[in-house]
């Protein structure tokens, strides 16, 4: 017997628990703080018995202030563990770079230079003098010194998925045909086409980011809230209250 999946329109959050799932932040501390203010205001005016704020990964790279984003998330989680913070491929890429200075990896090619700048390390200056390989080696040494241990431990501690009610949350998506509790961690932070092209319903509605869209995308089987915040200045989230679902946005300046 094939299990019938859950359609977005029928999906419900747990009774009495408000859910918020926030898309890729990429160094936009301003937008993350604005989204939290917006959610806090909502919870003040329409109190919920319980709530979870789920961050869908990619806190670092590209945008201007990755360091402050990580500081903000560490504080938020200390203040209330109902702030759930999932791993994205860029967050794992930063850990990988700190462990091994790969000159042509994700970090150096896709916005890690901006992350390093937020910690006071300037890769571009050294490239001018030394060429890439030497500049990366020097920058790597400086960055390992500059990134607080607490940030490294935090990045290492991030889970790859979480589920509440009829929703399954992860950074990139899932591999169709594989049970949700048996997903490969690489797929959860990297998958694109095999997931996006899948039209059938899943056992839960998948809420994800990773692949930027001009505005949040709601499909029968998934919701994508990555609205390219670092560049567009729009950070999006899915808000779930029982059977009621809506997309919320905060706006800042485009870069």
Protein language model annotation of sequence segments:
Residues 28-109:
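Core catalytic region of metal-dependent phosphoesterases/phosphodiesterases
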Residues 1-8, 33-38, 67, 149, ...:
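Short, motif-level signal for alpha-helix interfacial/capping segments enriched in acidic residues
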Residues 22-23, 54-57, 84-88, 205-211, ...:
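Active-site neighborhood of phospho(di)ester-bond hydrolases with catalytic His/Asp-centered motifs
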Residues 6-15, 46, 75-78, 160-163, ...:
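A short acidic-Thr-Gly-centered motif at the start of a beta-strand
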Residues 16, 48-50, 80-82, 165, ...:
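A general structural motif
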Residues 26-27, 61, 92, 174, ...:
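Short, glycine/acidic-enriched loop or turn micro-motifs at the edges of active sites
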Residues 105-110, 116-117, 121-224, 228-234, ...:
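Acidic, His/Gly-enriched loop-helix segments that form or flank divalent-metal centers
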Residues 1-34, 103:
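Short glycine- and acidic-rich boundary segments immediately preceding or forming the N-terminal edge
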């Amino acid at each position: 017997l094939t299990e019938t999946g859950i359609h977005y329109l029928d999906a419900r959050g747990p009774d009495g628990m408000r859910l918020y799932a926030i898309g890729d932040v990429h160094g936009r501390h301003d937008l993350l703080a604005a989204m939290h203010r917006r959610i806090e205001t909502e919870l003040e005016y329409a109190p919920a018995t319980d709530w979870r704020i789920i961050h869908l990964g990619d806190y670092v790279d590209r945008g201007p202030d990755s360091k402050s984003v990580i500081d903000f998330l560490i504080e938020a989680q200390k203040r209330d563990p109902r702030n759930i913070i999932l791993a994205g491929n860029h967050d794992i890429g930063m850990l990988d770079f700190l462990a091994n200075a790969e000159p042509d990896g994700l970090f150096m090619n896709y916005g890690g230079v901006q992350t390093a700048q937020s910690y006071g390390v300037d890769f571009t200056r050294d490239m001018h003098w030394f060429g890439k390989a030497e500049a990366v080696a020097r920058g790597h040494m400086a960055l390992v010194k500059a990134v607080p241990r607490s940030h490294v431990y935090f990045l290492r501690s991030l889970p790859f998925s979480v589920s509440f009610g009829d929703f399954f949350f992860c950074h990139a998506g899932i591999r169709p045909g594989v049970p949700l509790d048996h997903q490969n961690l690489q797929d959860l932070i990297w998958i694109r086409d095999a997931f996006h092209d899948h039209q059938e319903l899943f056992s839960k509605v998948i809420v994800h980011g990773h692949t930027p869209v001009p505005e949040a995308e709601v499909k029968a089987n998934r919701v994508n809230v990555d609205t390219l915040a670092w560049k567009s200045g729009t950070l999006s989230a899915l808000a779930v209250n029982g059977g009621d679902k809506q997309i919320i946005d905060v706006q800042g300046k485009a870069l």
